[in-house]
Amino acid sequence: MEAGETWNVSLEWPPPSLDLSTITQTPSTIVGSGIPLNYAGLSLIVIPLITLLGNLLVIISVLRYRALQSAINFLILGLAVADLLVAIIVMPYAVYVYVTNGDWYLGNLMCDIYMASDVCCSTASILLLAVISFDRYRAVSLPIQYSRQSQNVKRVWTLIAVIWLVSLTLASPMVFGVNVRPPDANPYECRFYNAEFSILSSMISFVIPCFLVLFVYIRIIIALKKREKAAKMRREKNTIAHGLTMRPDTGEEQVDEEAAGRIVAGPVVNVMMAALPSMTRRMRQFERHRRAIELAGDEEWEEDELDVMDECCGGDDAGDDDDDYHADNGQGVVEASAPRTTSMLRRIINAASVGTANSTAQSVASASGMPAFFAQNISTTSPSSSSCARTTTTTSAIPKASGDLPLPMLLNEREFGNSSTPRSSLESLSENVNVITNDFVSENCTTFSRRSSYADDSQPTSSQTSSGDGRSYSIKGQKRFRNLSRNYSTKHHRKVVKVNRGNSRNNSRTASITNQSDDALIPAIIRTISRKSPRLFRRDKTDIKKHSMILANPITEPPKEYRRVSMPIHPTNSQTETETISASRDIENLPTTTISRSTTANSAELLGSPDDFEKFPALITETVLEDVLAETREGCFMQPTVSFALTVREMEGNALNNLKGCSVESSRRVSQVDPPLAIQILTRPSLPHLDLQRMDSIGTTCSSKTRADSLRSVDSKGSKKSNRNGIAVKLVKRAIKHEHSLKRKVSKAQRKEKRATKTLGVVVGVFLVCWVPFFVINILNAVCILLNKDSCQVGYDLFFYCTWIGYMNSFMNPIIYTIFNTEFRRAFKSIIFGRNSTRHHFSNKQAHV
């Protein structure tokens, strides 16, 4: 019965102890308890719900899409987890406190758990923001070191674990008895009473990370400003330097036309550097990566291009190089000193480059559409016997007037910036290379020898002077360069000249080409290439018969059988391109004769059809022999001297106009020979191979030879070799494409880093706005408690609103990512709207970034 009575009492409602008079008429009180309620506070539940959904989207996006699985995004994932826990654990209790008008009816233990959860999750979120800021600082200040660890996910997870461990360690004392309530404390109030611990936790949770975030982000802004300023200055200077190299009347269309004819050194440099045994794959990849990072911020110009432009525009008179050309011991030596530049192609061309030097040669080049732009002096000597004086012929340099050269004479690194050759390898080679080619007649008529020789800096020479006007070339009045011929030589075959024209065996003929430099590396590189790839350097035996050497006498008018003698070239096994040819001949009954011989600076048959080079600018490489006319005095028998000049000419913007003018009509055309494939490497099929014809002593006539005719002839020649060597073409294109891809990847990565930095700035700004008021009030209240001054403490309402402003930081982070980060925005759309096509497109496009 007693149990039944007790049961009946327990079921009685309302309890007898409840005073029904305390129940008011307003609906804002709890029925039967007299606790006032603020139902308007239930609207705050929207904030944790949106925070929950937003951070869930961030977490799913990073875990689902491989493109977002980078180090920085995994840190953002950890931040989203912390904000998610804030929305699940902390915000609902804050809504409850607001609905109950600040009263806590859930007991002291739940109050301690609520405060510990608040401290732990908020501390983790703030520390993760600090780590993300430091990560952005490393990405901006140390990009190479950062790139090596950018995908180190293990390191990121370790940092996240450490941050959560610190946060739990900081919050756990609040649960294990640190929050001791005083005897007179309000039992319905949930607050932290330990002032010392409150100050310490605020310093660790907010103050130190806040100063770190501010310091790091200020440094990031300074670094970005410096980088943008430096890039802007480089672009301005390069634009000015580029403008100085062009004529004032150069129009936009002509600039495009000239740009299409610029020289590209990428293919040659790629092929040559591929043969160097010292360049390993790891070194090449590292150097390409380093250079691409350096160039990514500057899309149009390179820093080193300024040096090239300065050399191109530094002086307008090239006639001051008077001491560059010498002659000694009856050996005509032509020495050329080209301006120094970091261009690899510049050094290769300088190894065999001497410009034409008289007005007739200029007219021929102009008629052919190929102006001479290497200004150099050419000296020719004829050694005298004991009773004869030495006769010396000296030519002056061609002035580098801007009106004479529509395009820059020198090359710049922009033209082959897409080359995969490392920058260090370019600088490792010497600026100039000495090459000497000696052709002489030995005393033994049956002996033929061939050797390769290089110029020595210590070689004794005698200085020759130039007149400086670029047109004077006279011995006893008037001399002219003649017998210009373009005759391509065979590839890596010996060239033997058998000459039997007389009975004299005591006369020798010498011709030399020297390019002033510190060493001679280019011929060695060429030989290395030929040894590494012998099959690419061979030529069909049927092509050997097409080659010939031409002998002519420009001074007198001997019979036709003596004026032009075509002599076959007998091939032998040789891999050198710069050689010495020895032959014996009799010239007793013949007048002074000038020998014409052409050779190429690079005879490697490396690339295939010119049709594969539609994207390459044109490089017209002409091997021109300039015969220096030597006079003989009465009573003196002098040995004639032949001077060779190998010239690299560039098809300029006004080539079409020159071709429409007068062209020299020769009495004999050079035999039709396919050009060496090494020249085809640098030749674009859309631009013609211009034939330099021999000049006859009898007058010249004007003919209308247009560019289209030359183009058709080149295309017809190129079609014959369309099926030859396409492998090297593909390799070169692949290398250039890889370099383009590398630069695009680096540039794209830096753009993404910039967007991430911008997003970080917004996140940091929101973080400061949200959390600074709360922690200022929290520290101020703790100080007031230590000083026992209740008057300085902040009231409940202000403290509550500042706390909710701090919670809004977790609410704002996903919104910031959606607005300022295109990758997250695309991922959010794919998740919300279920766009599978968008997801697949996003994954495929960003998979390897």
Curated annotation (Swiss-Prot):
Question: For this UniProt entry, what's an example GO CC term?
Answer: synapse
Extract the InterPro entries matched here: GPCR_Rhodpsn, GPCR_Rhodpsn_7TM
Residues with an annotated glycan are: 8
Where is the protein situated, by its record's location annotation? Answer: Cell membrane
Alphabetical UniProt keywords: Cell membrane, Disulfide bond, G-protein coupled receptor, Glycoprotein, Membrane, Receptor, Transducer, Transmembrane, Transmembrane helix
Q: Which CDD domains match?
A: 7tmA_D2-like_dopamine_R
The biological process GO terms on file are: cellular response to amphetamine; cellular response to nicotine; chemical synaptic transmission; G protein-coupled dopamine receptor signaling pathway; G protein-coupled receptor signaling pathway, coupled to cyclic nucleotide second messenger; negative regulation of dopamine secretion; negative regulation of locomotion involved in locomotory behavior; positive regulation of locomotion involved in locomotory behavior
Presence of keyword Glycoprotein: yes
Q: Region Required for the interaction with gpa-14: what ranges?
A: 183-849
Parts of the chain that traverse the membrane: 40-60, 71-91, 113-133, 156-176, 204-224, 760-780, 799-819
Q: What is its main location?
A: membrane
Q: Which residues lie on this side of the membrane: Extracellular?
A: 1-39, 92-112, 177-203, 781-798
Polar residues: compositionally biased ranges: 501-515
Question: Where is it made, tissue-wise?
Answer: Expressed in all dopaminergic neurons. Expressed in neurons around the nerve ring and the posterior side of the body including PDE neurons. In hermaphrodites, expressed in the head and tail ganglia including in the RIA interneuron pair, and in a subset of sublateral interneurons and the PDA neuron in the tail. Expressed in cholinergic SIA neurons. Also expressed in the male tail. In males, expressed in the dorsal spicule protractor, ventral spicule protractor, dorsal spicule retractor and ventral spicule retractor muscles and the sensory post-cloacal sensilla B (PCB) neuron.
Cytoplasmic membrane side: 61-70, 134-155, 225-759, 820-849
Q: Where is the composition biased (Low complexity)?
A: 457-470
Coiled-coil residues are none
Keyword Oxidoreductase listed = no
Locations of Basic residues compositional bias? 477-498
GO MF terms here are: dopamine neurotransmitter receptor activity, coupled via Gi/Go; G protein-coupled serotonin receptor activity; neurotransmitter receptor activity
Q: Give me the disulphide-bonded residues.
A: 111-190
Q: What does this protein do?
A: G-protein coupled receptor which binds to the neurotransmitter dopamine with high affinity leading to the activation of an associated G-protein and downstream signaling pathways. Couples to G-proteins to inhibit adenylate cyclase (AC) activity and cAMP production. Inhibits synaptic vesicle fusion to negatively regulate the release of dopamine at dopaminergic neuron synapses. Antagonizes octopamine signaling in response to food by promoting the dopamine-mediated suppression of crh-1/CREB1 transcription factor activation in cholinergic SIA neurons.
Its family remark reads: Belongs to the G-protein coupled receptor 1 family.
What extra comment accompanies this record? Modulates drug-mediated behavior, such as the response to nicotine and amphetamine. Plays a role in the sensitivity to the drug nicotine and promotes movement towards nicotine sources. Plays a role in promoting amphetamine-induced loss of motility in water, termed swimming-induced paralysis.
Q: What is this protein called?
A: Dopamine receptor 2
Annotated organism of origin: Caenorhabditis elegans
| Name of the gene this protein is made from | dop-2
